């Protein structure tokens, strides 16, 4: 077996089998130069190696080459066969071990993050773990933390890359995204100013790095804050906050645009306008509400609700306002669908009209009796008197709820409801609430 030969060879030469491979199936007529060229073409682009020896295998009547690798076998890139004279030559390596694969990925991850196994052991408190629980190569690093302090170049999360070019390359960030990450991570770094500056320069490429090198050459003691201020002046947004405010104030809804869609488009402009302004969150909410009332054409119900909030000085925040607007839009859509479903044909309208008039004439005496009973009881209710504050609250409550019930007026009237009874009764109720009237006039019977 080729694998057994590989293991025996590694034991005989005291080598790690994870850093060795065996190439078998080499024809006997291949010279040493041909073998070297073939192995170089197949392995050199992938990893550094060294040929340690050759031998003859009686099982397949071919030669075998034993090769030492500079690093452990990378199973993702190493081919299982390489093209050579007489066909493909088989590459034999030690089978993949799940634990070895995990440690390999962990090492690559820690290398990219600028950390090591020592940092992991210190963070997890694993310095006193038994030797059999860790790999032999990891143990010297795990035992070292109590003996030597960590370096400043360790224990940090690397920043994203920023170059300052007009079109960022793949893997690079825009200045706004890069600056946001720097502002978030910088306070976490408990290191000296020199180390912070080194880490900052480590994330720069292209024109941004050239500018920072010039600034550092002119001032060796330049701080990270000064570096960021310089980058903001060069690559940051040049727009003044007054221009942002003007752009916000000039923003209007497009033709046919929903109120909720316009609010989504307006919010980034508002946040940008107030970013550098001395305005509180409450002022921002009030500005948003007043701008919608001034610029947007909306339904009377929605406008009544928003104007009531404006008058009371209780502006909703962005999420509350969005919920209010979308609920109103959903109600309008539902109302439109119901209107389309309830549209009768011309013949049906005539029949329903005759039926309504017939039922109205029958129900008129009953309506008169009900109105008289309400008229007799109304003085007792109103003459007790209501405080003016309660009356104003009821008026505000009626104004606020009128928008919520505005859809009821669009539905057809009930068949047993007379068309002439609503007007006087409603007018009398409003008059009694506003002027404190003690009684209501009796409605006259219907004339047939």
Swiss-Prot record:
<dbReference type="Pfam" id="PF20846">
    <property type="entry name" value="PNMA_N"/>
</dbReference>
<feature type="compositionally biased region" description="Polar residues">
    <location>
        <begin position="363"/>
        <end position="383"/>
    </location>
</feature>
<dbReference type="InterPro" id="IPR048271">
    <property type="entry name" value="PNMA_N"/>
</dbReference>
<dbReference type="InterPro" id="IPR048270">
    <property type="entry name" value="PNMA_C"/>
</dbReference>
<dbReference type="GO" id="GO:0042802">
    <property type="term" value="F:identical protein binding"/>
</dbReference>
<dbReference type="GO" id="GO:0005634">
    <property type="term" value="C:nucleus"/>
</dbReference>
<feature type="compositionally biased region" description="Low complexity">
    <location>
        <begin position="426"/>
        <end position="439"/>
    </location>
</feature>
<feature type="compositionally biased region" description="Low complexity">
    <location>
        <begin position="352"/>
        <end position="361"/>
    </location>
</feature>
<dbReference type="Pfam" id="PF14893">
    <property type="entry name" value="PNMA"/>
</dbReference>
<dbReference type="GO" id="GO:0043065">
    <property type="term" value="P:positive regulation of apoptotic process"/>
</dbReference>
<dbReference type="InterPro" id="IPR026523">
    <property type="entry name" value="PNMA"/>
</dbReference>
<comment type="similarity">
    <text>Belongs to the PNMA family.</text>
</comment>
<feature type="region of interest" description="Disordered">
    <location>
        <begin position="335"/>
        <end position="448"/>
    </location>
</feature>
<protein>
    <recommendedName>
        <fullName>Paraneoplastic antigen-like protein 5</fullName>
    </recommendedName>
</protein>
<keyword id="KW-0539">Nucleus</keyword>
């Amino acid at each position: 077996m080729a694998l057994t030969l590989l293991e025996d060879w590694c034991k005989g030469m005291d080598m790690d089998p994870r850093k060795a491979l065996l190439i078998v199936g080499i024809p006997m007529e291949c010279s040493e130069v041909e073998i070297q060229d073939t192995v170089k073409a197949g392995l050199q682009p992938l990893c550094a190696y060294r040929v340690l020896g050759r031998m003859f295998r009686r099982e397949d009547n071919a030669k075998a080459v034993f090769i030492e690798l500079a690093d452990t076998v990378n199973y993702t890139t190493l081919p299982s066969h390489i093209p050579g004279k007489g066909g493909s030559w088989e590459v034999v390596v030690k089978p993949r071990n799940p634990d070895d694969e995990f440690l390999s990925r962990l090492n690559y991850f820690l290398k990219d993050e600028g950390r090591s196994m020592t940092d992991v052991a210190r963070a997890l408190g694993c310095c006193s773990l038994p030797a059999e629980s860790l790999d032999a190569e990891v143990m010297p690093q795990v035992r070292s933390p109590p003996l030597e302090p960590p370096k400043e170049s360790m224990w940090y999360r690397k920043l994203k890359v920023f170059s300052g070019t007009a079109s960022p390359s793949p893997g690079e960030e825009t200045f706004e995204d890069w600056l946001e990450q720097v502002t978030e991570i910088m306070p976490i770094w408990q290191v000296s100013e020199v180390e912070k500056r080194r880490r900052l320069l480590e994330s720069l490429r292209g024109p941004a790095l050239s500018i920072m090198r010039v600034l550092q050459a002119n001032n060796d003691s330049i701080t990270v804050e000064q570096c960021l201020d310089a980058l903001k002046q060069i690559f940051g947004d040049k727009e003044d906050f007054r221009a942002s405010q003007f752009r916000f104030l000039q923003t209007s809804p497009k033709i046919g645009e929903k109120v909720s869609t316009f609010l989504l488009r307006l919010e980034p402009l508002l946040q940008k306008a107030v970013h550098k302004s001395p305005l509180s969150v409450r002022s921002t909410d009030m500005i948003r509400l007043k701008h919608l009332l001034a610029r947007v054409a909306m339904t009377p119900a929605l406008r009544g609700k928003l104007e009531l909030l404006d008058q009371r000085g209780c502006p909703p925040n962005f999420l509350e306002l969005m919920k209010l607007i979308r609920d109103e839009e959903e109600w309008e859509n539902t109302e439109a669908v119901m209107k389309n479903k309830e549209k009768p044909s011309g013949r049906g309208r005539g029949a329903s009209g005759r039926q309504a008039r017939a039922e109205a004439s029958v129900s008129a005496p009953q309506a008169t009796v009900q109105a008289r009973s309400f008229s007799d009881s109304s003085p007792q209710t109103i003459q007790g008197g209501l405080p003016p504050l309660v009356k104003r609250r009821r008026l505000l409550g009626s104004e606020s709820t009128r928008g919520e019930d505005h859809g009821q007026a669009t539905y057809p009237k009930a068949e047993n409801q007379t068309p002439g009874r609503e007007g006087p009764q409603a007018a009398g109720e409003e008059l009694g609430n506003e002027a404190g009237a003690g009684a209501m006039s009796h409605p006259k019977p219907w004339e047939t």
